[in-house]
Regions:
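Extracytoplasmic "Venus flytrap"/periplasmic binding protein-like
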Residues: 29-31, 46, 50-121, 136, ...
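Extracytoplasmic "Venus flytrap"
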Residues: 30-46, 65-67, 142-143, 196, ...
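Extracytoplasmic/periplasmic substrate-binding proteins
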Residues: 35, 202-213, 235-317, 323
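Helix-loop-helix "hinge/cap" segment bordering the ligand-binding cleft or interdomain interface
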Residues: 53, 57, 128-201, 216-251, ...
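Conserved C-terminal helix/tail region of periplasmic/extracytoplasmic solute-binding proteins
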Residues: 59, 243, 373-430
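Hinge/lid segment of periplasmic solute-binding proteins
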Residues: 91-145, 202-205, 289-294, 356-359, ...
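Short, solvent-exposed loop/beta-turn-alpha elements that line the ligand-binding surface or hinge
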Residues: 107-121, 162-166, 191-200, 213-236, ...
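C-terminal lobe and pocket-closing loops
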Residues: 276-286, 296-392, 425-430
Length: 430
């Protein structure tokens, strides 16, 4: 099998978009492929209509694909060379797309004022490490916070952190779980295992624990996983998480994903994405408190990255594509739609205008993680293999498998993919 085909197979196995082909629209036509919630679909439809009105003769075709079928659809379009001018992509897969030659930098195409307005975390999720070019941009970013009930925590005499630097230590976190269990909580914490392995959740939400404890999925200088993912620090991190499950502290996968704010609040804490805030707030009101992720090592580490927009390298009119993205990201109605759904800001101006994330807002501390503790998932072309291997390893570890064996197997799979692709030059330390 050719090297590139092996890469495509790995990406498909990881349920990831692999390639963005060379389909190009005419100068007066733009094609945009995306996935999203109903409010996002409506917002983009409105944007397209108003952009067409502002640019007579231009047609914007929106290719809306359900999230679960997105990668399959994209793969089919790639195989026929019929791909969009503008495409939405999940941030950690950007390195693969750029390495494959399917994206072009957005700098010089999107308004510079928007680029200057990006948060550091937003810049990192759209940047390709070898040339440090910015290849994608979005209005939003993402994070994971630790949610709790202020009344419940105060009643149990568990302190509530007031800054990222003030995050709970590992000892405080595990003591809180024990205390909450003893005080009657059915489950001290929901890690949202109910999301399963068909999403990025395991890598997205749990890799920060490894990073906080001083290890990683892969060495980001040599780009080798063996010796890093199977290091003692990572084994200790995986063993720690396995212990939480064995102690009965974690909501089981079979219980679903809303035990923190369900009736009776079976779960005392929630290790949840920023999107959990809106639903939990509706159920809990002002009793809801958002806290930073714990410091399992020297400092707290949080994730970032979400669905962002890039421009096909082969589009017939890259300037028009850039104009559309600028129009979209500057649009007040578009921003309002995301504000109403607690979109996590990727632009500083969007954050300042958000009552949830602005200074002293209920999620201001979670937003602070974007500049103080956010670390992107490994920006490497082998990421589809990296995330698939880690997801499977952690699933097995949660189910009782030996952490050292599972992490070693995962590291071997990752390094084998990189070796099969000649190191994904210019990556690698050789």
């Amino acid at each position: 099998m050719p090297i590139r085909n092996r890469t495509l197979s790995a990406l498909a196995a990881a349920a990831s978009i692999l390639a963005l082909g060379a389909g190009a629209a005419s100068a007066a036509e733009l094609k945009l492929m995306f996935q999203g919630e109903p409010f996002e679909i409506a917002a983009l439809q409105s944007i397209a209509e108003r952009f067409e009105a502002a640019h007579p003769g231009t047609t914007v075709e929106l290719i809306n694909t359900p999230h679960d079928a997105y990668n399959e659809k994209f793969g089919a379009m790639a195989s026929t060379g019929n791909l969009p001018d503008i495409l939405q992509l999940d941030a950690p897969f950007l390195a693969n797309y750029v390495w494959s030659g399917y994206l072009q930098p957005v700098t010089g195409l999107v308004d510079q004022a928007l680029i200057d307005d990006m948060t550091p975390s937003n810049v990192s999720q759209g940047t390709y490490p070898p040339d440090k070019g910015l290849y994608a941009i979005g209005l939003t970013d993402s994070t994971v916070a630790l949610y709790g009930s202020r009344k419940q925590l105060e009643a149990a005499q568990i302190r509530i952190p007031t800054s990222v630097a003030d995050a709970w230590t590992r000892e405080e976190f595990e003591a809180a779980l024990k205390t909450l269990k003893a005080s009657g909580a059915k489950w001290p914490i929901d890690l949202f295992r109910g999301y399963g392995t068909k999403t990025e959740w395991i890598t997205y939400a749990y890799e920060p624990i490894l990073k906080s404890m001083g290890c990683d999925l892969i060495d980001r200088t040599t780009w080798k996983s063996e010796g890093t993912l199977d290091s003692q620090a990572c084994i200790d991190a995986a063993t720690m998480m396995q212990t939480w499950v064995k102690e009965g502290w974690v909501v089981p996968q079979s219980a679903g994903t809303n035990q923190f704010y369900a009736e009776g609040r079976p779960a005392a804490l929630a290790w949840g994405g920023h999107w959990v805030y809106a639903e939990a707030k509706a159920a809990m009101g002002d009793d809801l408190v958002a806290m930073p992720l714990p410091r399992f090592g020297e400092k707290s580490t949080s994730p970032n990255g979400t669905w962002i927009f890039g421009i096909n390298k082969e589009t017939a009119d890259p300037k028009l594509a850039g104009q559309f993205l600028s129009f979209m990201l500057n649009d007040a109605e578009y921003r309002k739609a995301y504000e109403e759904h607690t979109g996590f800001p990727g632009l500083k101006s969007f954050a300042a205008a958000s009552p949830v994330y602005a200074a002293n807002g209920p999620m201001a501390l979670a937003f602070a993680q974007a500049t103080e503790s956010a670390v992107p998932r490994p920006p490497h072309p082998a990421y589809p293999t990296i995330t698939l291997a880690f997801q499977q390893a952690m699933t097995n570890i949660f189910d009782g498998a030996d952490p050292k064996t599972e992490l070693s197997d995962a590291a071997e799979k990752i390094d084998a993919d990189i070796e099969d692709n000649d190191g994904y030059a210019p990556f690698g330390g050789n």
